[in-house]
A protein has these predicted regions:
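Short, small-residue-biased leader/transition segments that mark boundaries at the very start
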Residues: 2-7
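Electropositive phosphate-/nucleotide-binding environments in soluble metabolic enzymes
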Residues: 26-33, 71, 75, 91, ...
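Glycine-rich phosphate/diphosphate-binding loop of Rossmann-like nucleotide-binding domains
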Residues: 46-131, 181
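Hydrophobic beta-strand scaffold residues
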Residues: 8-9, 88, 158, 189
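Rossmann-like adenosine-cofactor binding region
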Residues: 103-185
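Conserved beta-strand edge residues that scaffold enzyme active sites
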Residues: 14-15, 95, 137
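Adenosine-phosphate binding glycine-rich loop
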Residues: 12-53, 163, 168-261
Length: 261
């Protein structure tokens, strides 16, 4: 039997000491901003939405946007939505993060400590929901269930940025740029699995800027020394010579976890 020599370093799990994910940040920034751009488009009546302009006009209130998750995706979505004049709420379970967002985002962005009850209270008059919850290396939690769809008005738009991690809406399944949406119980679902792929020029440059230092380190030092010198890169290791060395990945796929020495 041929020995498996694959060394796999995963972008999503390269993690710095402050728990930031440097190789995921660029695509998260793009996806967060695109989620609002796409959400606004599918709120238009010809696209199956309510026919609401995200920022409203004088005398007509703007759309209400609920963003689930205040990380990089969520904060960029909030910044974009606020800039377009929407009524924005960001929900998260990290109070420190909520304080930071409250201090740094525009004043038309409100923060909310997330719970099932509080999310349910927001749904009846929400127009656009962005799902942006990330658990590194693991599946996203389902924050909106099938039953909760009935609490929203027909034409409400759900954008599931977490679809790459399984989605944070129970009714989500991956879609494509050529067929980005589907409707369940009157609710428009947008769940494109590679949102940044719609803007490849911007996405490629942003990702290259973040990736290049790691590529140079790997090329100059080899993977062992590069990972030894940089703990963030070492955390990105998922598979080494056929062994799964990242616990969350092993758990998700029910594989044996073999920590690297």
């Amino acid at each position: 039997r041929q020995r498996q020599m694959c060394i796999r370093d995963r972008y999503e799990t390269v993690e710095k000491a402050d728990h930031s994910l440097p190789l995921l940040i660029p695509m998260s920034e793009v996806a967060g901003r695109m989620s609002i751009q796409e959400g606004a488009r599918f709120l238009e009546k010809p696209q199956g939405g309510k026919g609401i302009l995200l920022g409203g006009v004088p005398g007509v209130k703007p759309a209400k946007v609920l963003i689930l998750g205040g990380g990089i995706v969520g904060s960029n979505a909030a910044q974009m939505a606020a800039g377009m004049g929407a009524d924005v709420t960001v929900a998260d379970i990290n109070l420190s993060r909520l304080r930071y967002l409250s201090e740094t985002l525009p004043k038309n962005v409100k923060t909310l400590y997330a719970s099932e009850l509080r999310i349910k209270k927001e749904l009846p008059d929400v127009d656009l929901v962005i799902g942006s919850v990330l658990i590194p290396g693991n599946k996203a939690p389902h924050l909106i269930t099938r039953k909760m769809l009935a609490m929203m008005q027909p034409g409400t738009v759900l954008v599931d940025v977490a679809i790459d991690q399984g989605g944070c809406f129970e009714t989500s399944h991956p879609t494509t740029h050529s067929a980005p949406t589907y409707v369940i119980d009157g609710i428009v679902h947008y769940a494109v699995a590679n949102i940044p792929g719609a803007v490849p020029y911007t996405s490629t440059l942003a990702l290259t800027n973040a990736t290049l230092p790691y590529v140079i380190a790997l090329a100059n030092k080899g993977w062992k020394k590069a990972c030894k010198d940089d703990p963030a890169l070492a955390l990105g290791l998922n598979v080494v010579e056929g062994k799964v060395v990242y616990k969350a990945v092993a758990d998700v796929f029910d594989l044996k976890y073999e920590p690297i020495n």
